[in-house]
Amino acid sequence: MSEKAYRQAMNFIENEKQFHLGFLPTEQSSPLTKNLDKEFAASSVDGVRCLQRVDRNVLEMAKRIFRSGEFAGLVETGKKTIADGGRIVFSGCGATGRLSILLECMWRDCCFKNESVKQHADQVFSIMTGGDYALVRSVEFFEDYQEFGRQQVREMGMDGNDMLVAITEGGETSSVLGTVDEALRRGSKVFLMFNNPADLLAEHLERSRQAIRNPGVCVLDLHCGPMGLAGSTRMQATTSEQLIAGGALEMIMCGLLKQVPPDYAAAFETLLDELEASAPAIASYIDFEAEIYRKKGKVTYFADDFLLDIFTDTTERSPTFMLPPFRKKDDKISPPPWAFVKNPVRTTPEVWENGMHRPLRCLEWTPEDYRRMGAPEAIRRNPPQIRAAELLKFEVGMESPEERCDSGGDAAVLVTVGGQGGSPVLQQAFDRISAGFRYQKKLAVGGDCPADFKITVSCDASPLHLMEHMAVKLVLNTASTGIMVVLGRVTGNWMSWVDVTNKKLMDRGIRLISEIGGIGYEESCIRLFEAVEELEKSRIPAKEKPSAVQYVLNAMKK
């Protein structure tokens, strides 16, 4: 081991205790899924049902929150903000950042399609740590810096007329808490929602305590226990936040449209019932996609509406399961992603224009900006390429389908939601673009049209189509997690191939090694930093990035 790796490990142990997060429920193993790998080994249907049990915890939390004064305050403050000409701004990072973008786009899409509320389109915004670029390619280390969040609030120009809804699954994400701090300074009304007990966060983490105990912050504690996959807050944590924040936003829209909002807790309960009844269909899809990967094939999802929902799930697979991330059209060296997303009826610029109903909002920060914000020297020297021009290099439209079907064993999957499945234009476009793929399949979430994999749900129509978005999220989360369990990238219910790209994930990797390998935190930390250094030295850009956690665990078996 080099002295540099040892110093880094000891620095993490001694000086980064605010990122030692094993005490948080969202970072712990759920007793409901402790044998998740064994359940899937028995059958994929058993595995799906095991995962679905944890979603019931979200329902119990939702019933409590929807009756709470804090939720009523969120809705009423939102209504007043819109009525007074202010803006509702959602902020988040990673999964919650993608959720923030999705919420904004759901609002804008409704305004675009309803003339009576068109004037309100520019009253809902989102702040995604890393900007819109991070929707399709994780910018993981950005979350470690509060100042980055503050700067994005400054660039948004928030003031006393505006309202911030900050969403952080764990309640401790630095960049999101930075948006809280800056919005408060600017006189904005601030709401903060997260999925760990507020008192526990305030007791242990200074950055969380400053926000939670601030009298200017209205806290919504959505605690609903550990995740179905330990530490994977893209699952139940973000599900609960999408349900609560989305429910509030849709109630605000219902007020503008003079409509009666649904009973969201009851609607969510019905959705869970229907998805549990569809467990065999979800399991069948899991087995199909897993087999494609076993044979070294690729999967490309095709969709028109709900494309942002699919982006969210596929992007998050990369850091969670150590899969190759999306690659740009001019990158001929990096390994191709296992899963990708394309629209068969629009070009890449049209995909973003139609999906967002606004210009791309990417970060255009310079080395001087990073210096002023106190970023590390490595970032200042080599700033990440996350501008709009770089985002457009990901060909998510109808262009170049041949790059996704060159192995002889690749699959094209058309994803439809509700009545969209009957669109002849979409079906014909899919038939044309998928002609070169070995397999062409259709995954239908709701609707009455025939499909290879049919998930039967009956979401009632509503202004923002919230329950349809919830259905897509739950189906894809369950499927993508199940696929990785089947392929051996989950041990028990631990994401044992996690990519340690920021401080929180480094801590998670250390605890994983300690849990599975049966050694102490300090020794696990030293071994992980050593592995990261060794693997970086031997890294071949054209090859898939190896897992440092797996490297350590495999070495311990020898």
Positions of the model-derived regions?
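Conserved N-terminal alpha-helical segment that immediately precedes and caps sugar-phosphate-binding
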Residues: 1-558
